[in-house]
Amino acid sequence: MSVINCEEVKRDEFHTEKYYESYNIFGAHIVTEDEMRGVRFTVWAPHAKAMSVVGDFNEWDYEQHKMLQVTEEGIWSLFIPHIEEREIYKYAIETMAGDVIFKADPYAVYAEVRPNTASVVFDIKGYEWNDKNWSRKKKKKSVYKEAMTVYELHFGSWKKKEDGTLYSYREMAEELIPYVVEHQFTHIEIMPLVEHPYDRSWGYQGTGYYAATSRFGTPHDLMHFVDECHKYGIGVILDWVPGHFCKDAHGLYLFDGTPTYEYKDKDVQENPVWGTVNFDLGKREVRNFLISNALFWMRYFHIDGFRVDAVANMLYWNKEGQEQSNEHAVSFLRELNEAVFAEDEDFLMTAEDSTAWPLVTAPTYEGGLGFNYKWNMGWMNDVLKYMECAPEYRKYIHDKMTFSLLYAYSENFILPLSHDEVVHGKKSLLNKMPGDYWDKFAQLRLLYGYFFTHPGKKLLFMGGEFGQFDEWKDLEDLDWNLHDFEMHRYMHDYFKELIALYKRSKPLWQLDHSREGFQWIDANNNEQSIFSFIRQGDKQEDALVVVCNFTKATYENYKVGVPDFEYYNEVLNSDAEQYGGSGQVNKKRLKTFQEPYHNQTAHVEITIPPFGVSILRPVKTRKGSKKQDGSKTKVRSNVTSRGKR
């Protein structure tokens, strides 16, 4: 990609039109002009009175390197010869009020390690990628009809060195990737890696949207990390925050002394929940900044997806106490998704949205926002409330476990067990479970069994796979020493077996977004808090029967209606002794009885374990078996879901 000389750019391309390569104009680019090597600095500051570039090269004297205003709308530029890579710099901006403020470059691709705040000249080009095979394989797969297991993590607290320092991008490639491969996750989702000044913001309050945070190394080091992920078949999703940004003095806030990237109207500018300000998504220059940024990460870092943070905060703003939709945000999100999918039709665009806004994952040409996935926050909240309830009272909130199936096909959903639910006093997943030590582990195994068999793709926050006992502590690493304890090892073994079963079982993911893929057997047994259902794949014989018991009672010879296959085998039981359970399993092949039950044509009798999930797979179809209407037996279903992009 060539650097565009900003003096040759028509002002309409950035100020009034869709221009998604703004990173080629703005920022600090190493170039040769008039046979001299140096750096071209370009910045947008529409209300600046004067601009200059400062750094060690001029002893931070803002009188030396004055910038030239090249458009009336406020593009400033300057070529400085003999400046080399790794030079640190800022922009000195004289405001209309006569003050001089110092700002980091909004388009810088590298920055000093915090607490320092200067931008760093860096040649982003030149990394040699080795992921062509990954790209070819990705194009052969459907993001809708494949297994998807996402491992969400915070880069700085997954694991630390013995002295407490952080692993670099390259070191994390050596530490993290084998772990992810062992657990058969298909993707990792990393909490924001844009440059940010405050560790405890977890990256959600950024100052440098184009700069991969220098806490862990250089941009090329991060490229190496992504390249290695692709080498081992792992997709990389980044958390991305296009709705709001932090108010640190060196960042985007009041960039030229006036609201530049944020709204002017204080009622909609301020975001009091997080102490941030909202991007002015109605301003063309801001849209070009953000959409160019998304494409920059795709093109330069080969990212496979974004989890777009706080979409609810973007869709609605609270002005004078009235909740109103933000039409700027609605049109921005549609424009963003159109640009992203024009670049890569196999990209993952996931909305973190807790609202009931319709058609979030419908294409824009159908009136949707254009995402292809949405976090199912309702499912997460309902299920965790149910699990936190004492088992004997769960029968009174039975609908929390069934309600999600009323809307499961209204969007393309990912089921998140995310970082938000294991922090700020909410307890870890394991510690949310009521009861004694054994009960907690049994119920977490049960939760995971329900999680992996419920329609929707899967996301789990780090530590959940082995039963992290304490809630997430962002300044520490995970409690890896828990592997010294037997029950945590059992939990870890169970999780790995469960995710392996999920990946090799087409019924659990092939029809995630179609009503054909799920059927209740019994959704109404609130007295015993038992749920049973069928997951179905494309083929009739691709079916699994799932029975979940959310109390500590054990049931012998429990009748479960099933599709009419001759035999069933239990392929997983969360109560097996090798997982730390009591051993109430169904070891023998289960013969079906030709008596209708639960609105099915046959039934089996099984042992249902305490706080357990039992997954049954048919062995073979009964030869010549017929339903009462004379048709061949198949799993009953309703209408298919609407078409996808």
From Swiss-Prot:
Going by the UniProt record, its keywords in alphabetical order are: Carbohydrate metabolism, Glycogen biosynthesis, Glycogen metabolism, Glycosyltransferase, Transferase
Q: Which family does it belong to?
A: Belongs to the glycosyl hydrolase 13 family. GlgB subfamily.
Quote one Gene Ontology molecular function term: hydrolase activity, hydrolyzing O-glycosyl compounds
Keyword Glycosyltransferase annotated = yes
Q: Which organism is it from?
A: Bacillus anthracis
Q: Which residues form the active site?
A: 309, 352
The protein here is known as 1,4-alpha-glucan branching enzyme GlgB
State how it assembles: Monomer.
Q: From its record, what is one biological process in GO terms? A: glycogen biosynthetic process
Function text = Catalyzes the formation of the alpha-1,6-glucosidic linkages in glycogen by scission of a 1,4-alpha-linked oligosaccharide from growing alpha-1,4-glucan chains and the subsequent attachment of the oligosaccharide to the alpha-1,6 position.
| Gene transcribed to yield this protein | glgB
Q: Which InterPro entries match?
A: A-amylase/branching_C, Branching_enzy, GlgB, GlgB_N_E_set_prok, Glyco_hydro_13_cat_dom, Glyco_hydro_13_N, Glyco_hydro_b, Glycoside_hydrolase_SF
Q: Which Enzyme Commission numbers does its entry carry?
A: 2.4.1.18
This protein's pathway reads: Glycan biosynthesis; glycogen biosynthesis
Q: What lineage, starting at the top, does this entry show?
A: Bacteria, Bacillati, Bacillota, Bacilli, Bacillales
- What domain of life does the native source organism fall in? Bacteria
Q: Which Pfam families match?
A: Alpha-amylase, Alpha-amylase_C, CBM_48
